[in-house]
Amino acid sequence: MQLANLILAQLVNGITLGSLYALIALGYTIVYGIVLLINFAHSELFMSGAFVGLGVMTVLTSSALASKFPWLAPAQHFFAGSTTGIVCMLLIMFLVSMIVVGVMGMIIERFAYRPLRHAPRLAALISAVGVSLFLQNAVLLWISAQQLPFPNPIGESTAFTIGTVDVSVLKVVIIITVIVLLVALDTFISRSRFGKAMRATSQDREAAGLMGIDINLSITLAFFIGPALGAVAGIFNGMYYGSIVFNMGFLPGIKAFTAAVLGGIGNLRGAMLGGFLLGIVESLASGFISTGYKDVIAFAILILVLIFRPGGLLGESVLEKV
């Protein structure tokens, strides 16, 4: 019975963690699918989303700010004092963070990647690493080098209990929100006009241009959507772990990249599957082996997939004629 409860608890943790990995992994795969670039700056956009979210929460709920700016007092009481206020605050946090980080992604694409679009891939890769280091150190210098507490406005109350395993409201909110976003993105890509244009650009950029599709718009849209989803993951990550720091994006970013490769880089549904699988495997390893080995296992999975199935679980092998 204890073993079953342990497995169940780790599965719940794994699905929650996998939801975040899947959301971040989509940012990697949607960009790679269109421009064949591993956007290593994506992990820092994930981090930026957390800091933007914390800033919005501070403005909306800080009593210190309300004392300095009396016109903020009614809003502070509303957002901090009722369930409706908390829900509205979360929606504002997510919306502002998604817009800010999405625009950051568009700016990065315009000035760091677009000039290198016809250059060797290594040049764009080096540019991505440079942008990542710039964003990380910008937060280090301009905000703080210390961990900042990230309040959880949802609280730690239990949503329901399975056996002896309590499932918190926060975990339920994370899982449901991520699933809704994944379904919405899949529907957008497969059915909307812009989504079809992005798919056409991904399949054959030159042919799509000849058919009248705005290639630059499709690529820019990809660089908005991916970081925007990463911003949501950043906020949830802050609430889940209770703190954020300037270099918080590195490990989740690498693991999300592993999830994207596991599912099939460039395949949206593969990234979703890879994220959930990696989260579950990592949580089970933490419960049955040691928390110290969870990162080792994630990187071992990446190495094994690259060796034995580089196309990923849902990816396709491509043969190039020479």
Regions found by a protein language model. Give the residues of each.
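Short loop segments and helix-boundary regions at transmembrane helix junctions
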Residues: 33-41, 90, 99-146, 188-193, ...
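Alpha-helical transmembrane segments within multi-pass membrane transporters and channels
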Residues: 66-131, 273-278, 282, 309-310
